[in-house]
Regions:
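N-acyltransferase acceptor-side catalytic subdomain
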Residues: 1-380
Length: 380
């Protein structure tokens, strides 16, 4: 077939209807929608000034129909990725080579597994074409982070093109026909159940009350308060926040049903907030913060309130985001993730391949070990 590649400096160069027509049936497909990617760009979270240059890959047929697309960025650093390659960059620098710029296909600042290559139909030539196009770009390497939904043909094409798989682990909560939160607690071991009840009791004794809002119930003042919490959390760790208030307002404007905000109140008013993204029967824990600090409120806002809500709403899974082994004590289970990497320099590619082989074995052992320390009773 006669395909033509075109790179986009802005997602709005293609109609939302054309881009979104490529989204597959996947729990996280909505997170690579036109509206989500546009929110990052239009709110100035991306661009040359941030070290994220938009360069989305698109493929068009002879009739000028969009047949495939992939979010793509030219990166001048490794911030906001949650798959860590700083050591690779340092190794390049020690040997006098430039690691940056590199090419990255990912959902910016968001460690959620999902589709990256979007296709109208399953033409077996699309994946090899995309890989060849990336190789032709000027840069040290290309990376596809938190990729999910690849088929056997995709895997074969990536391996033949010398792409390397890297595994990681996150922690997800799964619905198991729980009727309510108490039913969920009863599935846990006694020690974990006791600990959670104690933590919730202490939050209650401090006079913290929670509500959740979504869709039309969310107003600009709710977002302004959430952003104050979000920004304070980043500043307390000595970092500037990646996202702007305009991003959240833009996302709410285009996809009001996407966000679920949990708000904690003390006697002075709102004191903390956590934000989840929702897509169909799956939820994704994203951000948390507080303007006044209380013990155990983080667990209530980020885990217990969302789990209660998920059981009521028929949500089948809450993805807990990056890292956080402490989530296991609160009923989250380990879940593997994968990313793919291609390095142009043969010697560095060989070294990274050996490193990833060892790291992969370590991750296998870690996942096995984590399974043995689940919070649930041995017979569930």
């Amino acid at each position: 077939l006669d395909y033509r590649t075109r790179y986009l400096d802005r997602i709005i160069e293609v109609p939302a209807s054309a881009w979104d027509s490529l989204l597959p049936e996947h729990p996280a497909a909505g997170l690579v929608s036109h509206g989500m990617l546009a929110a990052f760009e239009e709110a100035d979270c991306l661009g040359p000034q941030t070290g994220w240059e938009v360069h989305h890959w698109t493929l068009w047929d002879a009739e000028d129909n969009l047949v495939a697309a992939m979010p793509l960025y030219r990166k001048w650093h490794s911030y906001g990725e949650y798959v860590f390659d700083w050591a690779w960059a340092n190794a390049y620098a020690r040997h006098g080579f430039d690691y940056y710029p590199k090419w990255l296909s990912a959902l910016p600042f968001t460690p959620i597994s999902g589709p990256r290559l979007l296709r109208k139909h399953n033409d077996l030539m699309i994946m090899p074409r995309m890989l060849a196009d990336l190789k032709a770009l000027d840069g040290s390497s290309a990376h596809c982070l938190f990729s999910d939904g690849l088929n056997e043909s995709d895997l074969k094409a990536m391996q033949e093109a010398s792409w390397m798989r890297r595994t990681g682990v996150q922690f997800h909560w799964y619905q198991a026909n729980y009727k309510d939160f108490e039913d969920f607690l009863n599935a846990l071991s006694q020690s974990k159940r006791k600990k959670i009840r104690a933590e919730r009791r202490k939050v209650n004794e401090q006079g913290i009350r929670f509500e959740h809002k979504t869709g039309a119930d969310l107003h600009e003042n709710d977002w302004a308060f959430f952003y104050a919490c979000y920004e304070r959390t980043y500043r307390m760790h000595g970092n500037a926040p990646y996202l702007t208030l305009a991003f959240f307002l833009r996302l709410h404007e285009s996809q009001p049903e996407r966000s679920v905000l949990f708000l904690g109140h003390d006697e002075l008013g709102p004191c903390c907030a956590s934000l989840l993204f929702r897509h169909k029967d799956r939820a994704f824990g994203r951000y948390w913060g507080a303007i006044r600090d209380y013990p155990f409120v983080h667990f209530e806002a980020c885990y217990y309130q969302p789990i209660e809500w998920a059981i009521r709403e028929g949500i089948q899974c809450i993805e807990g985001g990056a890292q956080g082994q402490h989530k296991m004590a609160r009923g989250f289970d380990p879940a593997p993730t994968e990313s793919w990497h291609w390095l142009r320099h043969p010697s560095f590619a060989n070294a990274v391949e050996q490193f990833l082989s060892k790291e992969g074995l370590h991750m296998e052992h870690l996942l096995d070990e984590l399974q043995e320390h689940r919070a649930f009773k041995s017979v569930r």
